[in-house]
């Protein structure tokens, strides 16, 4: 089964993390079987990376996505974003470490 990573790098406007986070969504917005992380730069507290991991068939994953809801979510976050860096869906090609104790490809 293929694992995918949705990842975005955002530079937030100063002091807007709480508002951005509220617009980003809740645990209930995460697809079943997925896990999401939000991390903050140690050198720039306004730079955050949000990423989520999900296993499955990409066509099936896309079929469960609500494009209108995602567009509304993006619009709600936009006022708090100064800039966006990397932003996309990536295929996990290696998993290394703690979960399995082994390297898999």
Give a label for each model feature:
Residues 9-21:
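Short, surface-exposed ligand-recognition loops at beta-strand->loop->(often short) alpha-helix junctions
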């Amino acid at each position: 089964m293929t694992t995918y990573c949705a990842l975005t790098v955002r530079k937030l406007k100063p002091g807007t993390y709480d508002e951005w986070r509220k617009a980003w969504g809740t645990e209930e917005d995460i697809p079943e079987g997925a896990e999401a992380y939000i991390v903050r730069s140690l050198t720039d507290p306004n730079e955050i990376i949000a990423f989520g991991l999900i296993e499955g068939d990409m066509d099936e994953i896309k079929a469960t996505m609500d494009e209108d809801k995602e567009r509304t979510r993006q619009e709600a976050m936009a006022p708090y974003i100064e800039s966006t860096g990397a932003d996309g869906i990536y295929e996990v090609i290696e998993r290394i470490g703690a979960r399995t104790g082994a390297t898999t490809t």
